[in-house]
């Protein structure tokens, strides 16, 4: 991949647009973590500025690990935050000074750019949304699908985060400079220890549809008679609305006494959860990679996940875990 930028001995001014933010309660998962981990490693040689989405109580500007972070858009609610981010990030491309633009694409908060800026851009594609857009957000699903197709066809340099996602892209567009950049895990993922306890673990963003948590709860409700002492723990970031949905579904299924929804946890608590789990579940409907599956493997635990792009690369069937058909609760 040949990149636009300054001479080899000069720092490159990199503008990185990504709605996701590690501290964003609406959308702060593995994509945000990946972006920060890469950027902080580049910050000692280059000038990095990230434009991320706004949320309630967020500082407008801050610097982390040498990376400038600007939060733009409305913090009123999630839809307003997404929409206003698209408008202001698109406008920022006209005023910001940069040599290279890294664009983490999201069909629900696209950034519009002219040909000049597209020519100095690397488009990073985490996953192909396709028909899931209509199921997840019916009101904006069709525009999201069209935006995804248009974006794939409009940029020449693309990065995918798993072989299966790159294959999905190849089926939709041709003649692109496609590159694969995996997502790694921290050393702490290998340092997990502790006795195995009595629970199954889900760790990740508490997004009911995307992560298939409704399927997980329904499947868990079926093992009550055969494994009455086994618990299910859900840990990760999520809005009050999403957590409420999961609590309601648990009650409807009659498993509320065996399901614990922790919400966000510290790194130390995360390691303890991984160390004590019987195994981890990832029943996602779509993924780009599945960093939690790699973290689970590093901790020496098995993963049960869905046979979808991303997870088919992150989980080796019958070696590091099991792959099941999507939507399956049997």
Where are these regions (language model features)?
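Glycosyltransferase donor-sugar binding loop
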Residues: 203, 231-245
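Short hydrophobic beta-strand element within catalytic cores of glycosyltransferases
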Residues: 293, 302-305
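Conserved donor-binding/catalytic core segment of Leloir-type glycosyltransferases
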Residues: 15, 159, 193-211, 217-220, ...
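Aromatic "clamp/platform" in nucleotide-sugar-dependent glycosyltransferases that forms part
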Residues: 285
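Nucleotide-activated donor-binding/catalytic signature segment of Leloir-type glycosyltransferases, i.e.
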Residues: 244-265
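Carbohydrate-associated surface elements
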Residues: 164, 184
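Active-site proximal beta-strand in glycosyltransferases
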Residues: 14-15, 100-102, 114-133, 159
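Membrane-proximal helix-turn-helix segments that form the acceptor-binding/catalytic region
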Residues: 139-160
């Amino acid at each position: 991949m040949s990149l636009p930028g300054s001479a080899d001995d000069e720092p490159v001014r990199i503008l990185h647009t990504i709605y996701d933010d590690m501290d964003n309660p609406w959308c702060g998962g593995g994509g945000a973590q990946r972006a920060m981990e890469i950027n902080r490693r580049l910050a000692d040689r280059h000038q990095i500025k990230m434009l991320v989405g706004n949320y309630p109580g967020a500082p407008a500007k801050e610097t982390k690990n040498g990376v400038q972070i600007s939060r733009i858009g409305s913090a009123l609610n999630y839809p307003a935050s997404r929409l206003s981010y698209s408008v202001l990030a698109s406008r920022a491309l006209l005023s910001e000074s940069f040599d290279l633009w890294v664009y983490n694409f999201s069909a629900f908060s696209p950034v519009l750019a002219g040909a000049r800026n597209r020519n100095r851009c690397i488009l990073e594609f985490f996953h192909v949304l396709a028909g899931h857009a209509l199921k997840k957000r019916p009101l904006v699903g069709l525009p999201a699908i069209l935006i995804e197709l248009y974006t794939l066809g409009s940029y020449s340099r693309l990065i995918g985060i798993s072989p299966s996602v790159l294959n999905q892209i190849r089926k939709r567009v041709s003649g692109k400079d496609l590159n694969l950049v995996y997502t790694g895990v921290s050393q702490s993922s290998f340092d997990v220890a502790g006795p195995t306890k009595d629970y199954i673990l889900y760790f990740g963003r508490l997004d009911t549809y995307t992560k298939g948590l409704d399927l997980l709860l329904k499947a868990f409700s079926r093992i009550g008679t055969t494994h009455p002492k086994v618990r299910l723990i859900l840990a990760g970031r999520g809005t009050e609305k999403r957590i409420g949905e999961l609590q309601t579904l648990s009650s409807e299924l009659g498993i509320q006494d065996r399901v614990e929804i922790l919400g966000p946890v510290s790194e130390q608590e995360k390691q303890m959860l991984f160390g004590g789990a019987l195994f981890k579940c990832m029943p996602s409907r779509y993924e780009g990679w599945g960093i939690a599956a790699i973290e689970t493997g590093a901790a020496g635990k098995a993963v049960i996940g869905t046979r979808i792009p991303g997870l088919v690369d992150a989980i080796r069937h019958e070696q590091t875990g099991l792959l099941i058909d999507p939507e399956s609760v049997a």
